[in-house]
Amino acid sequence: MVLIRVLANLLILQLSYAQKSSELVIGGHPCNINEHPFLVLVYHDGYQCGGTLINEEWVLTAAHCDGKKMKLQFGLHSKNVPNKDKQTRVPKEKFFCLSSKNFIKWGKDIMLIRLNRPVNNSTHIAPLSLPSSPPSQNTVCNIMGWGTISPTKEIYPDVPHCANINILDHAVCRAFYPGLLEKSKTLCAGILQGGKDICQGDSGGPLICNGQIQGIVSVGGDPCAEPRVPAIYTKVFDHLDWIKSIIAGNTAATCPL
């Protein structure tokens, strides 16, 4: 029986794919080194998440990725052979939709992090654009991260893996996730046939559609990549006003209802 879970390895999510004998994921591939300058590795106390650089001083990730002694790495591709322009920062401030940090509430799994100092744009570090409009159904989008590449074993790659998935009708997710509201501020995305999905270790990572961040990895099935069990992503477009207000200095801004 497939169980619902917050895709976290003790508070974290990761991309998940079934493996081929070549050690590549089914339907996915190791990301090109120049394919993800906005991708952030968020980690604390042995846990890891993904994140997205949206300007030189701000990162978007999932609320359930929060933790003490958090660090963020930028410009990272291979964990074993870091790029020369890799940079590390820590949070200066964190902002959440709910003061209780109750990220389980659909559409509230979002955290905006202000860095202790801006990063310097470089060959492997550059921000990703916020959405200009929401994605339509059947849009092909990209997921990526250093998460486990097996749905049944925790096998973490040295470099992030990338795969394409589709924006699906919200009804597909509502059929599996009890309590998911029709108008919740989330996106339903995946492959109905299974085989490509997010999994443990990539919570907070981006769902990228047409060169813009449209979603934040939030919740998925267990095991990962099961047929007709897509994942849920916090919908960035519905939080644009909140994000822009916080960045502009209005720290009292409230999230959409």
UniProtKB/Swiss-Prot annotation:
The species this protein was found in: Trimeresurus stejnegeri
Native organism taxonomy: Eukaryota, Metazoa, Chordata, Craniata, Vertebrata
Subcellular location: Secreted
Tissue-specific expression: Expressed by the venom gland.
Signal peptide per UniProt: 1-18
Family: Belongs to the peptidase S1 family. Snake venom subfamily.
Protein name in UniProt: Snake venom serine protease KN2
Main location class: secreted
Alphabetized PANTHER family for the sequence: KALLIKREIN-1 (PTHR24271:SF47), KALLIKREIN-RELATED (PTHR24271)
Gene3D superfamilies: Trypsin-like serine proteases
Domain Peptidase S1, first and last residues per copy: 25-248
Domain of life according to the entry: Eukaryota
Keywords: Disulfide bond, Glycoprotein, Hemostasis impairing toxin, Hydrolase, Protease, Secreted, Serine protease, Signal, Toxin, Zymogen
GO cellular component: extracellular region; secretory granule
Enzyme Commission code(s) on record: 3.4.21.-
